Amino acid sequence: MEDHQHVPIDIQTSKLLDWLVDRRHCSLKWQSLVLTIREKINAAIQDMPESEEIAQLLSGSYIHYFHCLRILDLLKGTEASTKNIFGRYSSQRMKDWQEIIALYEKDNTYLVELSSLLVRNVNYEIPSLKKQIAKCQQLQQEYSRKEEECQAGAAEMREQFYHSCKQYGITGENVRGELLALVKDLPSQLAETGAAARQSLGEAIDVYQASVGFVCESHTEQVLPMLQFVQKRGNSTVYEWRTGTEPSVVERPHLEELPEQVAEDAIDWGDFGVEAVSEGTDSGISAKAAGIDWGIFPESDSKDPGGDGIDWGDDAVALQITVLEAGTQAPEGVARGPDALTLLEYTETRNQFLDELMELEIFLARRAVELSEEADVLSVSQFQLAPAILQGQTKEKTVTMVSVLEDLIGKLTSLQLQHLFMILASPRYVDRVTEFLQQKLKQSQLLALKKELMVQKQQEALEEQAALEPKLDLLLEKTKELQKLIEADISKRYSGRPVNLMGTSL
């Protein structure tokens, strides 16, 4: 018998309510009785004496049976003056709380209510808070990862921006202005390149001419015409290259004014056309308006193909064609349009110049290889009749000339000059380059802003976690207290046998 008293009673928490109902510790209709009790508690707490402990019991927690017992004990002290000789209290406060306790003890309603609170906390409230805290921790990790990605991305885009600016030869403070300034300096850079070519290409051209003339018996004027011209006259204008005479006047195009000038011309021609059409329309109205004579054109002229609005339209078209033709023509000795550009500025002549440089560079590179090899009897006999300039060439001289040519080709084909040439050929290209570079900087700024947003969201998630953790700790404490109260109450009903509520995981 004693061994039986020490056998514990194990109850699954999820089935605690069913266990109490099955063993008739409480009624099936306990929920309706609990609702009545809650209404009476809500009414009773409206009239309570001033007590710090009572206020603490009533603030922020679910009031259950054991709270009511404690409140009743406190009221016995505050309402002692209302106690009569029979040991009863005339105070309405005492009567209200005594009634609440009596309702709780009816059919053990307090026990099933406590069990319901325990099951709800274990199955729903505690897992929900833990899930929210885990979500906050996950968000913090995700926001931290995104913060690092945004920081790295912003630094990379900023580095790409400055690297691209370095390739263009600008600092990036004012992209458009710096590019236009470089384009303005482009003629002087090309003039220096032309001067360097003029000074350094003489011997190389002579060697190539002599070699072609010796091997192919080709006329010297057919060899590298552009390089020969630059070697004699430098980086002159296209007009001088095309005509052979130096222009008396050079009218260079203005880069910045070109798009605005085109837009203004288009607007002017549009206004002229509108005026012409409006005048023709006015004349047509005057001709139809009851024969009114405006003193400008006779009414009969409106039917003549050479008069009124039709004549004005033809004149407008003829005038437009005349102006366009005048824009493409230039007087004798005046370099205008592409003719006003230098050989290295104009695309076609610059490409020809580069082609001839590469042709000369390939020839000299091959010649340097031949000079580095041991000469056989056949080659020696062949070059006995060659010009003196060919016989006097050495490997060192040839390699030096190749190095000079490679340097010139590298300058003219550099990425910076390529973009400047494109801007020179199409002024709108500077806007495209500016937009391209600014886009990298904007992306860097957007990533920096996104990084700040990730920091803010990470802080918000941290604050939310800090607010949830005390709630979870308090709920765990209250749930453990409920578990102990329920286990102790059930143990009393079974002669003090130990009771274990299983599955709480607290």
Swiss-Prot record:
The keyword Nucleus applies. It is found in: Endoplasmic reticulum membrane; Cytoplasm; Nucleus; Cytoplasm, Cytoskeleton, Microtubule organizing center, Centrosome. GO terms for molecular function: ubiquitin-like ligase-substrate adaptor activity; ubiquitin-like protein ligase binding. A motif (Shuffled ATG8-binding motif 3) lies at residues 310-313. GO terms for biological process: apoptotic nuclear changes; cell population proliferation; definitive erythrocyte differentiation; endoplasmic reticulum unfolded protein response; liver development; mitotic G2 DNA damage checkpoint signaling; mitotic G2/M transition checkpoint; negative regulation of MAP kinase activity. Keywords: Cytoplasm, Cytoskeleton, Endoplasmic reticulum, Isopeptide bond, Membrane, Nucleus, Phosphoprotein, Ubl conjugation, Ubl conjugation pathway. May be phosphorylated by CDK5. The shuffled ATG8-binding motifs mediate interaction with both ATG8 family protein and UFM1. The RPL10a-binding domain (RBD) anchors the UREL complex onto the ribosome via association with RPL10a/ul1. Substrate adapter component of the UFM1 ribosome E3 ligase (UREL) complex, composed of UFL1, DDRGK1 and CDK5RAP3. Interaction with UFL1 anchors CDK5RAP3 in the cytoplasm, preventing its translocation to the nucleus which allows expression of the CCND1 cyclin and progression of cells through the G1/S transition. Interacts with ATG8 family proteins MAP1LC3A, MAP1LC3B, GABARAP, GABARAPL1 and GABARAPL2. Interacts with CDK5R1; competes with CDK5RAP1 and CDK5RAP2. Interacts with RELA. Interacts with CHEK1; may negatively regulate CHEK1 and thereby stimulate entry into mitosis. Substrate adapter of E3 ligase complexes mediating ufmylation, the covalent attachment of the ubiquitin-like modifier UFM1 to substrate proteins, and which is involved in various processes, such as ribosome recycling and reticulophagy (also called ER-phagy). As part of the UREL complex, plays a key role in ribosome recycling by promoting mono-ufmylation of RPL26/uL24 subunit of the 60S ribosome. Belongs to the CDK5RAP3 family. This is CDK5 regulatory subunit-associated protein 3. The gene is CDK5RAP3.
